[in-house]
Amino acid sequence: MAALREVRDVELQQVWDGVAARSVHGERLTLALVELDPNSVVPEHSHDHEQLGLVVHGSLRFRVGDETRDLSAGGTWRIPSNVPHEVHVGPEGAIVVDVFAPTRDDWRERDRVERAPRWPRPS
């Protein structure tokens, strides 16, 4: 894989219903630009990966463990390994950046989705 790429050239993969990601995998971590449809839900789940994230556009109600908060552009999260979490997306949808360590190898073979990136918008 090339060291330098444009996000529009990264394949979009289905992660959940209404949730798709463009992921770049390194040796030790995964960076994902995640597109969440309006009013979609990421059901409660947990994984071995530590996860950090940032809202780029839109709004979410995010629950990590026992903490719930409404987040909009600029909001961040930190999810330790194996902590249950879930997301409810606002009516305008959302774009977020997620970082996972170790790599999300389970995301490498997800079903492909054919559509143009929602972010960044063409100039």
Label every model-predicted segment.
Residues 1-28, 32-33, 109-123:
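A short, N-terminal "cap"/entry segment at the start of jelly-roll beta-barrel domains
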Residues 81-106:
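Ligand-binding loop in jelly-roll beta-barrel domains
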Residues 34, 53, 77:
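Conserved GNAT-family N-acetyltransferase fold
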Residues 28, 47-48:
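Short, small/polar residue-rich loop motifs at catalytic or cofactor-binding pockets
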Residues 49-60, 65:
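Glycine- and acidic-residue-biased ligand/ion/polar-headgroup-sensing regions
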Residues 67-81:
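Short acidic-glycine-tyrosine-enriched beta hairpin
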Residues 30, 59-61, 68, 84, ...:
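Structural motif
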Residues 32-46:
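Conserved short histidine dyad/triad with adjacent acidic residue
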